[in-house]
């Protein structure tokens, strides 16, 4: 069992989910139903989130996600690293590339096809995704995984810092032309980098 998300990072807000990581020896649909029943009996069940997986399935997980999974999880019972496949630096690089591709596609698709209000509603999630990408890019560049947004912000420069700062400025109203343009140009630059 482990913990992820804002509770792990010390960034709990009024809308924060409680992200629990649970690995079950042999996960079944009955286990899922029982887990759901337990969660629904707890206070604030609507904030339950996280990662639930069978041990054998986790051992076969795509190495692309393992670097992020290990760094974004604090063990509380057992050792997650003993349950996952090995990963290489190339896997972490490909995780960043894949995530950048997905973010870029989301921005382009929403900007063209969504109403302006809907696009502005999508932007906070896009900036949140950028935070996770920045965490991993910073790790690849420095070997240090900054656990919190504030810690990462202190370590960033230039447009990277500008993107994370915008994510942190949740009180500032979202402005489509400004905020979509910043994230779009950041994605372009990151995707077209020759190396990570």
Feature annotation, model-predicted:
Residues 1-7:
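Short gly/ser-rich loop at a beta-strand->alpha-helix junction or flexible surface loop bordering the NTP-binding
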Residues 3, 15-17:
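Alpha-helical architecture
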């Amino acid at each position: 069992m482990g913990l992820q998300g804002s509770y792990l990072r010390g960034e709990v807000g009024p809308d924060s989910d409680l992200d629990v990581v649970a690995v079950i020896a042999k996960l079944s649909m009955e286990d899922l139903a029982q887990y759901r029943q337990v969660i629904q009996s707890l206070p604030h069940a609507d904030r339950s989130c996280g990662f639930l997986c069978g041990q054998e399935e986790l051992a076969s997980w795509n190495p692309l996600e393992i670097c992020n999974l290990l760094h974004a999880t604090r063990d509380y019972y057992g050792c997650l690293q003993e349950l996952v496949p090995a990963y290489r630096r190339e896997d972490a690089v490909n995780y960043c590339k894949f995530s950048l591709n997905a973010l870029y596609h989301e921005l382009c698709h929403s900007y063209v096809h969504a109403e302006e209000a809907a696009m502005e509603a999508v932007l906070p999630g896009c900036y949140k995704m950028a935070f996770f990408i920045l965490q991993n890019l910073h790790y690849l560049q420095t070997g240090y995984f900054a656990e919190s947004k504030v810690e990462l912000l202190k370590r960033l420069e230039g447009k990277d810092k500008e993107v994370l700062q915008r994510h942190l400025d949740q009180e500032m109203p979202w402005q489509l032309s400004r905020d979509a343009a910043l994230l779009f140009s950041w994605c372009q630059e990151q995707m077209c980098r020759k190396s990570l």
